[in-house]
Amino acid sequence: MASYYEILDVPRSASADDIKKAYRRKALQWHPDKNPDNKEFAEKKFKEVAEAYEVLSDKHKREIYDRYGREGLTGTGTGPSRAEAGSGGPGFTFTFRSPEEVFREFFGSGDPFAELFDDLGPFSELQNRGSRHSGPFFTFSSSFPGHSDFSSSSFSFSPGAGAFRSVSTSTTFVQGRRITTRRIMENGQERVEVEEDGQLKSVTINGVPDDLALGLELSRREQQPSVTSRSGGTQVQQTPASCPLDSDLSEDEDLQLAMAYSLSEMEAAGKKPAGGREAQHRRQGRPKAQHQDPGLGGTQEGARGEATKRSPSPEEKASRCLIL
């Protein structure tokens, strides 16, 4: 294990303020919620940082550490006497607190990750996007040349009576692919969702892949757009598409009425519809039959005659169809 000064990246002559600034920077850097993809290593570093700060921030403990090292505090080696170590019974050893307790004591009830924006320069305005107990955190890495890697994380803390909830979302762009990891810690349970280019790829609960949770989440996401599509499709189907068919039917009815009218006119004039051999003879003898329409009083000649200039009426067309 490296020395406490190396862990906090400060010289041995660092002042108390230097120790505090170093702990703030390192604790936020290695907080497990900030490193969901490298949890075990982050937890180890987070614990070392808390231990180093707990010793170097205390003047008496720092003196013991400078003289005897870490063994002088744990009692595993040649260390100070009971009087030097402070009050305690025989065999006194220093007991380190949990890193989470040190973290909460240092930052209090405020937003711990908001502290980073003091040193982010032009990005400090992004702090306003978070609420009192939440705030975004951004990190940038090399993007030159041909390699694009950007990650962002947002944290939400809900401290309460023994309850702690943390939501972390990180997005990384690597070689044109977008990898998004969402990690939720609540009531001692960890849920991690991993997306690639917007497609959910995996869901793990407490480090164990959960296919059932993955299927339920995929189904929930697919239901939302399908409901919208179905509601929109109903309106499209209401567009009337039968108008051309209705128009054709109306034209057929008009033609039938015209034909019936012509037949009645011919019967009233004492003529019979052409048919049988007489009709065949007339069709073979001349291209077009000549007939007189008593209703209109006009004549029509065949192809050899001289055609009239006016256009035939619907009744005349119907009569011509019957004759032919």
From Swiss-Prot:
Q: What residues make up the propeptide removed on maturation? A: 322-324
Domain UIM: where? 210-226, 250-269
Per its UniProt record, what CDD domains does this chain match?
Answer: DnaJ
Ranges for domain J = 2-71
Result of changing S219A: Loss of interaction with polyubiquitin chains, loss of interaction with PSMA3, and loss of the ability to protect ATXN3 from proteasomal degradation
Motif CAAX motif: positions: 321-324
Q: Where is the composition biased (Basic residues)?
A: 280-289
Q: In which tissues is it expressed?
A: More abundantly expressed in neocortex, cerebellum, spinal cord and retina where it is expressed by neuronal cells (at protein level). Detected at much lower level in non-neuronal tissues including kidney, lung, heart, skeletal muscle, spleen and testis (at protein level). Isoform 1 is more abundant in neocortex and cerebellum compared to isoform 2 (at protein level).
Q: Where is the composition biased (Polar residues)?
A: 224-241
Give, from the UniProt record, the effect of changing E265A: Loss of interaction with polyubiquitin chains, loss of interaction with PSMA3, and loss of the ability to protect ATXN3 from proteasomal degradation
Give the signal peptide range.
Answer: none
Q: Where is the composition biased (Basic and acidic residues)?
A: 303-324
Give any single GO term for biological process: positive regulation of protein ubiquitination
Cellular component, GO, one term: cytoplasmic side of endoplasmic reticulum membrane
Residues with Phosphoserine modification: S311
Swapping E222A leads to an effect described as: Loss of interaction with polyubiquitin chains, loss of interaction with PSMA3, and loss of the ability to protect ATXN3 from proteasomal degradation
In this chain, where does the modification Cysteine methyl ester occur? Answer: C321
Q: What does this protein do?
A: Functions as a co-chaperone, regulating the substrate binding and activating the ATPase activity of chaperones of the HSP70/heat shock protein 70 family. In parallel, also contributes to the ubiquitin-dependent proteasomal degradation of misfolded proteins. Thereby, may regulate the aggregation and promote the functional recovery of misfolded proteins like HTT, MC4R, PRKN, RHO and SOD1 and be crucial for many biological processes. Isoform 1 which is localized to the endoplasmic reticulum membranes may specifically function in ER-associated protein degradation of misfolded proteins.
Q: How does it assemble?
A: Interacts with HSP70 (HSPA1A or HSPA1B). Interacts with HSPA8/Hsc70. Interacts with PSMA3 and most probably with the whole proteasomal complex.
Output the PANTHER family linked to this UniProt entry.
Answer: DNAJ HOMOLOG SUBFAMILY B MEMBER 2
Fill in the domain comment.
The J domain is sufficient to interact with HSP70 (HSPA1A or HSPA1B) and activate its ATPase activity. The J domain is also required for the HSP70-mediated and ubiquitin-dependent proteasomal degradation of proteins like ATXN3. The J domain is required to reduce PRKN cytoplasmic aggregation. The UIM domains mediate interaction with ubiquitinated chaperone clients and with the proteasome. The UIM domains may have an opposite activity to the J domain, binding ubiquitinated proteins and protecting them from HSP70-mediated proteasomal degradation. The UIM domains are not required to reduce PRKN cytoplasmic aggregation.
| The protein's name | DnaJ homolog subfamily B member 2
